[in-house]
Amino acid sequence: MSIDLISMILLWFGLYYIVSLSLNMEFGYAGIPNFGKALSVLVGAIAVGGILDRLLMLYFGIGGDFITGTTYATSAINNLIASNPIVGIGILILAIILASILGFVVGAIFILPSAKLKEDYLGITLLAISEAVLLICTYNLNIIGGYYGISTPDILAFVSGEYRGWVFAWIVLFIAFLVYLFFERLLNTPFGRVLRAMRENENTVKAFGRDIMKLRIKTMAIGSAIGAIAGVLYSLYTVNIIANAFTRVDWTFFPFLMVLLGGKGNNKGVALGVLCYVIVKVLLDIYKYNIKYALGIPFEPVWLSYMLFGVLMLLILYYKPSGLIPEKPIITPPMKKKIMEISGK
């Protein structure tokens, strides 16, 4: 396995793990079927392309056409980053902050029209809203350049090309690890236990005086804020944003596959699911034509991954609905103390 292949696997693992962790909180813990997950990733791209790029244009005094202006602005900032790496780090931090705030607000607003719906209708409504926003971003050139796309800053302009992939992969992995620690801490609190209770039986949660709508809004706001971080990292890695890159297949359905494969409600299981998916995905992308000629597949190999992962999704739902690492029961500190007392006796 080549060095570049390993760095690509690590990079995609980090990106998808961030998205899948946020989806695991929404779906695995809270039971919200967020079929519009791609929207939160798109929001991260909007924060970079629609807000950060405009700020750079203002800073360098560049006017005129938005798409052309971003090209000049990113070229100017890249030259600055190449001589001063701190600027690149600052842009990354600023982009993450902007995306998190925007994602939090959009996530809360996103769920409002459908927060009181049952699971089936809720999932369909979220999908419809997400697709509508994607279409608007695709055909409105003033948001993120539409189908033409726009340039984004190269935060690693000071790193030579042969090492850029590795450095960016480690940055993404580090941020993914921080996100993992955040969710482990958050979901092992009373808030996380309430989300599990809401997933199992909303009426029970209502009986204890908790507002289901407020819980859903909080969950979606946090999940969207984290999902937007993945959008930022992806946009900065590719140094280009195009709306068509944020489809429901890549950023909604495949993350659902990873969560279900690893085990919903279990962040460690999700990591295993993401790793399995990413390894297969990267290998298929690289060797798809070799597989086509070796097996004599009578269709274009570009569709092979969609077919394979679609069949895998059905097999998981039918034979292994709990995933590779099933969710563990909740054991609170008082319960642990009681168990230790009993075992001691």
UniProtKB/Swiss-Prot annotation:
Cite the InterPro entries for this sequence: ABC_transp_permease, LivM-like
Q: Name one GO biological process term.
A: amino acid transport
Task: Give yes or no: UniProt keyword Ribosomal protein.
Answer: no
Q: Which chain regions cross the lipid bilayer?
A: 3-23, 42-62, 91-111, 124-144, 163-183, 222-242, 269-289, 297-317
Q: How does it sit in the membrane?
A: Multi-pass membrane protein
Asked whether the keyword Transmembrane is assigned, the reply is yes
A GO term from the CC aspect: plasma membrane
* Record keywords, A-Z: Amino-acid transport, Cell membrane, Membrane, Transmembrane, Transmembrane helix, Transport
State the Gene Ontology terms under molecular function: branched-chain amino acid transmembrane transporter activity
Top-rank taxon, per record: Archaea
Question: Mainly resides where?
Answer: membrane
Name the Pfam families on file: BPD_transp_2
Report the subcellular localization.
Cell membrane
Annotated function = Part of the binding-protein-dependent transport system for branched-chain amino acids. Probably responsible for the translocation of the substrates across the membrane.
PANTHER family cross-referenced by the UniProt entry: BRANCHED-CHAIN AMINO ACID TRANSPORT PERMEASE PROTEIN LIVM-RELATED (PTHR30482:SF1), HIGH-AFFINITY BRANCHED-CHAIN AMINO ACID TRANSPORT SYSTEM PERMEASE (PTHR30482)
Q: Which family does it belong to?
A: Belongs to the binding-protein-dependent transport system permease family. LivHM subfamily.
Query: Which protein are we looking at?
Result: Probable branched-chain amino acid transport permease protein LivM
